[in-house]
Design a protein with these regions (language model features):
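Short, basic, glycine/proline-bearing loop/turn elements
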Residues: 47, 118-122, 153
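Residue-level "edge-of-site" marker
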Residues: 64, 126, 188
Length: 244
């Protein structure tokens, strides 16, 4: 039933939303930053509605660590498709997610994602991946935060909620080259909403923790060299706290 309701809602949202995006495209060009923020707020509202319809209760901690006027690199473990929804609603500034390139084939979704700074990466194409990393660096320099899941794919280990696959170090070039801070994010419970019951949606509780910002300039050379492993350890600690 929830899947049907979400499907109906998305149909209405995308239908009405295309008119809204058209208006923003027409009138928002005089102040593109303000227009982008309005569109991001529209997406956040849509995500909150989907979570409500899906019966998802999000328990968030550390939201005081989310900056309002500073572009950062968010780094999180990846459990399910709902990871995007339960984190995006707490990002205070425009935040673009790095997504799999296959999502680019979904017409309406692609338009929305591009409007809020999302980028599409083909992890099988090294040259294209590097291009996306460079674009991410420029976006951060222009005030748009970037959200990545460095595991590269959803973790399917259901026996250990604190398990995290190896982080791909290349993703962290965004922080290394732009000088932005890194916000570690821990997520628990999203797989139980959808992936564990495909194709059905089950309501439930999701836990999201935003850790204290990591400034690479304050780390020693060894920690900077292995920043992916350092962030992974920080997120693991947050996941352990969620299980306590």
């Amino acid at each position: 039933m929830r899947l049907i309701l979400v499907g109906l809602y998305l149909f209405l949202y995308f239908t009405v939303g295309m008119f809204y995006l058209g208006a923003e495209w027409l009138f928002g060009r005089w102040n593109q930053k303000a227009s982008m923020l309005r569109q991001y707020r529209f997406v956040q509202w849509g995500f909150r509605c989907i979570l409500f319809i899906s019966g998802v209760k999000v328990h968030a901690k550390g939201t005081e660590n989310v900056p309002e006027d500073e572009a950062v690199l968010y780094v999180a473990n990846h459990r399910g498709i709902f990871d995007v929804l339960v984190t995006a609603i707490y990002c205070k500034g425009v935040t673009g997610y790095i997504s799999k390139i296959v999502i680019k084939k979904v017409p309406c979704l692609r338009v929305y994602m591009k409007r809020i700074g999302c980028l599409f990466m083909d992890r099988e194409d090294i040259k294209q991946s590097l291009k996306i990393i460079l674009e991410s660096i420029e976006q951060v320099k222009n005030g748009i935060s970037i959200f990545i899941f460095p595991e590269g794919t959803r973790n399917k280990n259901r026996e250990d909620a604190t398990d995290i696959a190896t982080f791909k170090e290349g993703s962290f070039k965004v922080a290394q080259k732009s000088g932005c801070r890194i916000i570690p994010v821990a997520i628990t419970g999203t797989a139980e909403i959808f992936e564990d019951h495909l194709p059905w949606i089950h309501g439930g509780h999701v836990y999201v923790t935003f850790g204290e910002p990591i400034d690479m300039k304050t780390l020693d050379k060894e920690e900077q060299k292995h920043i992916g492993e350092y962030c992974k350890d920080r997120i693991h600690d947050l996941l352990v706290e969620q299980q306590a």
